[in-house]
């Protein structure tokens, strides 16, 4: 293969059969269970990178079911998102996500900088409640429940919340092990079509694990729970801060 061909074809590895396709990345009937809880502010300060700022000691614990996604297929994801501000702009910082499908793990890490790891999350309706779980190996590290569709939420308000900015810390090492990419990335969910939004009584239990440390941000109080279904496009990102250029 000629050098010019390598340059023109290079998108993702392997060169001749990339682990994920080019976008746009559209999700149909993407389903969220988001349980917001109050946690230890000191622990948040230890893990949220500057220049992001913590506004309140809150965490969104998310279980996300994605049965129909462009190029990524059928998978489920779970993890923690922390409400933050960047230059006065409110958004969410994704701390870690755990999922069961290789293409979105590879694409998420390489394109945007999503902190994704392989695990076994689930999200489904269990009789009268919606149930989310996360297993890392053989250990159950997260269990979330919410009463099924107890009360409608305002669709327009929830669409605005989904459309807000999200922040990622993208880290890619050089071949010698030093940092080659260390950037704060901002991205948005786009073309959102809300199909439903509900709330109800909720619970969240987190268990310690050395490699899936969701319990390092302890649950002190449940603040809010939301069950959302929407079609949306996962927009590509932009670098808002380059740690290596400072």
Swiss-Prot record:
Keyword Lyase (UniProt): yes
Q: Which residues form the active site?
A: 116 (schiff-base intermediate with acetoacetate)
Q: Which InterPro entries match?
A: Acetoacetate_decarboxylase, Acetoacetate_decarboxylase_bac, ADC_dom_sf
EC primary class: lyase
EC number(s) recorded for this UniProt protein: 4.1.1.4
- Any Pfam family hit: ADC
Q: Which UniProt keywords apply?
A: Decarboxylase, Lyase, Schiff base
Keyword Amino-acid biosynthesis in record: no
Catalysed reactions, as listed in the record = acetoacetate + H(+) = acetone + CO2
Entry's Gene Ontology molecular function annotations: acetoacetate decarboxylase activity
Give a short account of what the protein does. Catalyzes the conversion of acetoacetate to acetone and carbon dioxide.
Similarity comment: family membership: Belongs to the ADC family.
Specify the protein name. Answer: Acetoacetate decarboxylase
The source organism is Burkholderia ambifaria (strain MC40-6)
């Amino acid at each position: 293969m000629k050098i010019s061909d390598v340059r023109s074809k290079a998108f993702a590895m392997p060169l001749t059969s990339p682990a994920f396709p080019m976008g746009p990345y559209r999700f149909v009937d993407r389903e969220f269970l988001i349980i917001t809880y109050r946690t230890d502010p000191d622990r948040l300060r230890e893990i949220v990178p500057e220049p992001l700022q913590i506004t309140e000691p809150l965490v969104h614990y998310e279980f996300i079911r994605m049965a129909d996604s462009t190029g990524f297929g059928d998978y489920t994801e779970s993890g923690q998102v922390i409400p933050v501000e960047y230059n006065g702009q409110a958004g969410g910082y994704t701390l870690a996500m755990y999922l069961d499908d290789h293409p979105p793990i590879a694409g998420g890490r390489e394109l945007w900088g999503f902190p994704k790891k392989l695990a076994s999350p689930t999200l489904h309706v269990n009789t009268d409640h919606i149930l989310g779980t996360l297993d890392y190996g053989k250990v159950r590290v997260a269990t979330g429940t919410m009463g099924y569709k107890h009360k409608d939420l305002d669709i327009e308000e929830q669409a605005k919340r989904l459309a807000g900015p999200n922040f990622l810390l993208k880290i890619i090492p050089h071949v010698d092990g030093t940092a080659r990419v260390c950037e704060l990335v901002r991205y948005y969910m786009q073309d959102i079509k809300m199909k439903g939004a509900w709330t109800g009584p909720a619970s969240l239990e987190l268990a310690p694990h050395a490699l899936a440390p969701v319990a390092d941000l302890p649950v002190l109080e449940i603040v809010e729970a939301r069950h959302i279904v929407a079609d949306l496009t996962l927009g590509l990102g932009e670098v808002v801060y380059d740690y290596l250029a400072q």
